[in-house]
């Protein structure tokens, strides 16, 4: 039975209007910190909390006094809409890297915040509640031994956070209840924090992606492809966007018959078209052939129309993301794959990418070997046993084959898995990233995510489990994480081809879980419209695009006309240490590498400027010398001798 994909409870309580802040977001200052990448809060405390009795002090002294007070505060800096729900003093954080540290634990409606003044600078741990997967009680009231009674939070970003409470203090129960309430608001009929957060940014990220503009950039509509509004009310397919691009010679009535033959009504629609050859990438779900091998004349005609729209080739490739054995097994459920007998001039290729359950188990194994400790002696064999990089390789290799067929083969391709919202999104978006330099810019990548993932119905709510306490839900899977990992692998192989840096990718992943922004909420465009997310929440792109300098790759050089062919072999892939092992202070560099790049480039620019100044000075001196040499006072008149 299909699980309900509704997200109506995500914002069950309308957010009250709050005074907008024009300050940008900022991270809490930390040194010995396992701080996740949070947005920034320029206002650390409200103005009411600062005494004004000494206003006669000089401004410098007042600032110094107030900054000292802020350093001593144990409460977290609060975002607009954020408020404290519980606080427990004398709690011990069992840090797996630096040992136990005692401090104050605070729960707000957005974050879990721990601060210890025992160290200099203060130790700060700051995690959004959205990243929490489950909360467990450790020990009972009669537990003996130091730090044997407390709570453990298991997080979606690889971490486990363990806190010890004193049994006599009775703070554990209160903290546990508030964590269960505010970390899982959907399970408690409460709104996600994104509906409470009201920060104002210079740019509205919800307006970043306009499908008409994006299709126009690709040259659509044209004589072979048209934009249809048949799905304007999401009646053809409730998981597809309102606007679809389909073959120009296929009328809307036939689209309905094609939809009845495709799983969930997800017909083949255009994702990308080559600007020269007109070869296309179209995406869809599996055909409903079943064990009896049913056929659909309308579906066969439709794929023929896709092939005919490309005059460069008289063949079409169908890339099925699944292993062939899985595709065959789907026939028993009414699904299946295209028969080459039924679809003339079509070649079917299976890409052997495993399903969401295999990927979830692979990530679980990866977490076991990277957090908290790494076993050096068996590191390579342990990593191999997770099969994580093997899955990354298969996804990249599949996207590479698609891109190569379109670019080198000038052949149109159709891509699908079972339902067309997981592996299909990985493959189409990665292939488009290889083919189109626009998507390798910051804004272009944001458009790519909006288009191929959000508008085409990747089930973010189900795959991530926003605000849902059911951590064992079989629908959870790291599909989008794998896509971002593949992008990172490409940036390693082509360090100057992407406008964005590693921090950009990590920030996207952190806010995939945080529930601070509305971008990744719900499962479809239709659901986001019903929830009115553009009006009730802030877009992640609003935040990112307000401080582009933080996310820009200083080595970027525009390669807009270049097609990237990454090497998809195990020898060229590596574990993304900057993400999966970033919490281990022994494994991360002293400073982010992109900051060092910026410093070196700034130094180079400074030296280039000096060279230019010296060249101008030399040129000026040379000109001055020439002028003096040719002046009348210095001129010697040649003597002509008459013979």
From Swiss-Prot:
Domain named GRAM: residues: 68-139
Principal localization reads: cytoplasm
Annotated residues for binding of a 1,2-diacyl-sn-glycero-3-phospho-(1D-myo-inositol-3,5-bisphosphate) = 330, 355-356, 418-423, 459, 463
Q: Which Gene3D superfamilies match?
A: Pleckstrin-homology domain (PH domain)/Phosphotyrosine-binding domain (PTB) (2.30.29.30)
Q: What is the effect of changing residue 357 to N?
A: Decreased phosphatidylinositol-3,5-bisphosphate 3-phosphatase activity. Decreased phosphatidylinositol-3-phosphate phosphatase activity
Which GO MF terms are attached to this record? Answer: identical protein binding; phosphatidylinositol-3,5-bisphosphate 3-phosphatase activity; phosphatidylinositol-3-phosphate phosphatase activity
Pull one GO CC term from this UniProt entry. postsynaptic density
Say what the protein does.
Answer: Regulates the level of these phosphoinositides critical for various biological processes including autophagy initiation and autophagosome maturation.
Fill in the subunit field for this protein: Homodimer (via coiled-coil domain). Heterotetramer consisting of one MTMR2 dimer and one SBF2/MTMR13 dimer; specifically in peripheral nerves stabilizes SBF2/MTMR13 at the membranes and increases MTMR2 catalytic activity towards phosphatidylinositol 3,5-bisphosphate and to a lesser extent towards phosphatidylinositol 3-phosphate. Heterodimer with SBF1/MTMR5; acts as an adapter for the phosphatase MTMR2 to regulate MTMR2 catalytic activity and subcellular location. Heterodimer with MTMR12.
Query: What is this protein identified as?
Result: Phosphatidylinositol-3,5-bisphosphate 3-phosphatase MTMR2
What is the species of this protein? Homo sapiens (Human)
**What high-level taxonomic lineage is stated for the organism?**
Eukaryota, Metazoa, Chordata, Craniata, Vertebrata
């Amino acid at each position: 039975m299909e699980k309900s994909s509704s997200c109506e409870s995500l914002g069950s309580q309308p957010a009250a209007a709050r005074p907008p802040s024009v300050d940008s977001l900022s991270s809490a200052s930390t040194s010995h910190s396992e701080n996740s990448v949070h947005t920034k809060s320029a206002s650390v405390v409200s103005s009411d909390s600062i005494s004004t009795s000494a206003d006669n002090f000089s401004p410098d002294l007042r600032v110094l006094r107030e900054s000292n007070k802020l350093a001593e505060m144990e409460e977290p800096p609060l975002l607009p809409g954020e408020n404290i729900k519980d606080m427990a003093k004398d709690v011990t954080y069992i840090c797996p890297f630096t040992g136990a540290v005692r401090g104050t634990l605070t729960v707000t409606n957005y974050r879990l915040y721990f601060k210890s003044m025992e160290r200099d600078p203060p130790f700060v741990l700051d995690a959004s509640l959205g990243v929490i997967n489950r909360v467990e009680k450790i020990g009972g009231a009669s537990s003996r031994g130091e730090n044997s009674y407390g709570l453990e939070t298991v997080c979606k970003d690889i971490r486990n956070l363990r806190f010890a409470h004193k049994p006599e203090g009775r703070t554990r129960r209160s903290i546990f209840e508030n964590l269960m309430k505010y970390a899982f608001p959907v399970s408690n009929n409460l709104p996600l924090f994104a509906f409470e957060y009201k920060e104002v940014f210079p740019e509205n990220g919800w307006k970043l992606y306009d499908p008409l503009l994006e299709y126009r950039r690709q040259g659509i509509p044209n004589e072979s492809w048209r934009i249809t509004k048949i799905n304007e009310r999401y009646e053809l397919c409730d998981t597809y966007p309102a606007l679809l691009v389909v073959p120009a010679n296929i009328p809307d009535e036939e689209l309905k018959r094609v939809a009845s033959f495709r799983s969930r009504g997800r017909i083949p629609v255009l994702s990308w078209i080559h600007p020269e050859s007109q070869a296309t990438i179209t995406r869809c779900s599996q055909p409903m052939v079943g064990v009896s091998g049913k056929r659909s004349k309308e579906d066969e005609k439709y794929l023929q129309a896709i092939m005919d729209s490309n005059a460069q080739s008289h063949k079409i490739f169908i890339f099925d993301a699944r292993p062939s054995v899985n595709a065959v097994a789907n026939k028993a459920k009414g699904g299946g794959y295209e028969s080459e007998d039924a679809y003339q001039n079509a070649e079917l290729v299976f890409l052997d990418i495993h399903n969401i359950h295999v990927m979830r188990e692979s990530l679980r194994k990866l977490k076991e070997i990277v957090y908290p400790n790494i076993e050096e002696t068996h590191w390579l064999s342990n990593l191999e046993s997770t099969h994580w990089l093997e899955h990354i390789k298969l996804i990249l290799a599949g996207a590479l084959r698609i891109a190569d067929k379109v670019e080198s083969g000038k052949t149109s391709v159709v891509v699908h898995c079972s339902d067309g919202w997981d592996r299909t999104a990985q493959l189409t978006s990665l292939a488009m990233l290889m083919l189109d330099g626009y998507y390798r810019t910051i804004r272009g990548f944001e458009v790519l995510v909006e288009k191929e993932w959000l508008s085409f119905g990747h089930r973010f709510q189900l795959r991530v489990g926003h605000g849902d306490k059911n951590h064992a839900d079989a629908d959870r899977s790291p599909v989008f994480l794998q896509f971002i990992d593949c992008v990172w692998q490409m940036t390693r192989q082509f360090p100057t081809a992407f406008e964005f840096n590693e921090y950009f990718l990590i920030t996207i992943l952190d806010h995939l879980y945080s529930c601070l922004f509305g971008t990744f909420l719900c499962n479809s465009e239709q659901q986001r419209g019903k929830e009115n997310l553009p009006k009730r929440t802030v877009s992640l792109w609003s935040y990112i695009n307000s401080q582009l300098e933080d996310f820009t790759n200083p080595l970027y050089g525009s390669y807009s006309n270049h097609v990237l062919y990454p090497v998809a072999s195990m020898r060229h892939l590596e574990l993304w240490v900057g993400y999966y092992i970033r919490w281990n202070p022994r494994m991360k560099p002293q400073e982010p590498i992109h900051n060092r790049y910026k410093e070196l480039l700034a130094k180079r620019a400074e030296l280039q400027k000096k060279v230019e100044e010296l060249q101008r000075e030399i040129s000026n001196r040379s000109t001055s010398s020439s002028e003096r040499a040719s002046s009348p006072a210095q001129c010697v008149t040649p003597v002509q001798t008459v013979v």
